[in-house]
Amino acid sequence: MVSLIILFRLTFAIANRVRTLMKVLVIVSFFVLTGSASADSGALSLSGAAEALCNASKRLKSVYAFVQAKTKYATEKVREFEDMVELVRLKIVRVRGNEGGNGNWTSCTGIAKFLKRVGSKVNRVKRRELKRLRYLGYSAVGAAGIAAGRLDEMINVWRRAYSSGKGDFCVGNSEHHATRNQLLNCYLSDSEKDEFISLGDMHRMERVEEMNMTRESMNELLRLTGGGGNPLERYVHSANCHLTNTRPGGGYLSENSTSRRILWGDGIISLKRSGRGFVGGTGKTRAEVLIHDVTWEEDPVNNVPVLRNAYRELRKFVNLYAYIEELAHETGAHWNWEYAQAIVNTGTHGNKSTVVVDEDSGKSFVVLGNRETVQEEKLLEEMAICGVGRADSLRRTLALLFLLF
């Protein structure tokens, strides 16, 4: 009898222990399925993803200064074209046709033909190409500004998602969340309102040239080299960042998983549906199947729409600028050669005060100090060579040319 009582008590005790153990297992399972979802959520690395985004944003904003400088230079080249026309006209009419020179160059007909030929190139650059260059410049600056804004917007949301406690952040390093002073290519360091660098902050922009605007250089800014291309902070097992967590109770839906991937920065990163935000890597953010919870785009210029558009508009501007620069060089060299031949044919030897190019300074065109004085002196020379009647005909031809300018 005593043995039965003891056996009953042991059985009852074991049953209680089993029930207790089952409760513990249920609780543990609950936290594994729910609570640990947020515990796994990683954060974007400060030295990797965040700095790459800010570097790219600053480069895109620097497009404004780049376009402004190139447009100004091209405009100056056209002005030098105009000055060249004036100077060549003056110097040609000074070569007296019947004083041992080539009559074709010194006749009114020869002058008019020469100016019409070279003047048409000036008109094409000034009226068509320069106008188009300005338009393409506006488009390039606008597209680059939109792209920079998308990246800034992403940084602003993710950086501000943090708690004062250690380890609760969405952008940071192994110790703490990222501060403004750690992202100086994004934020104004002297601002207390999380203000970003704007196009007007020219002294904060980088000096860029064509070599900095290639597809390769832009992609290099956004290439993650550390951690095997992982955009997440690898020294923090859990940053408790719900922005990388797309499961129920994460940063997007309270009771359900997201049905599709989530894109940030127009696709610079992609969050897998029902991902816990723990595994990160580099790949195609718009691929049909995402391997990583958090994927960083491997080819941003091609696959991120705002960056692709910014690059495309910028290349249009750069290509047209290169064409104008080449045309200026070729036309200037051609003019100088023809003028030099004319001087040789007339037996007149030029010096530094008369030649079109100053070889010592290397300047392609002579900029006139007083355009009106030169024009008046040139007209008197034309009248002296051609006679009053013929000068009227020449002036009509030249007047048509001036209308083109």
Swiss-Prot record:
Pfam family, one: Trypan_glycop
Disulfide bonds listed in the record: none
Membrane association type: Lipid-anchor; GPI-anchor
InterPro entries: Trypano_VSG_A_N_dom
Gene3D superfamilies per UniProt: Variant Surface Glycoprotein, subunit A domain 1
GO cellular component: plasma membrane; side of membrane
Chain positions listed as propeptide in the UniProt record: 392-405
GO annotation, biological process: symbiont-mediated evasion of host immune response
Lipidation (GPI-anchor amidated alanine): 391
Localization annotation: Cell membrane
Keywords: Cell membrane, Glycoprotein, GPI-anchor, Lipoprotein, Membrane, Signal
Signal peptide from the UniProt entry: 1-50
Domain of life from the UniProt record: Eukaryota
Residues listed as glycosylation sites in the UniProt record: 55, 104, 256, 351
Name of the protein this chain belongs to: Protein PAG1
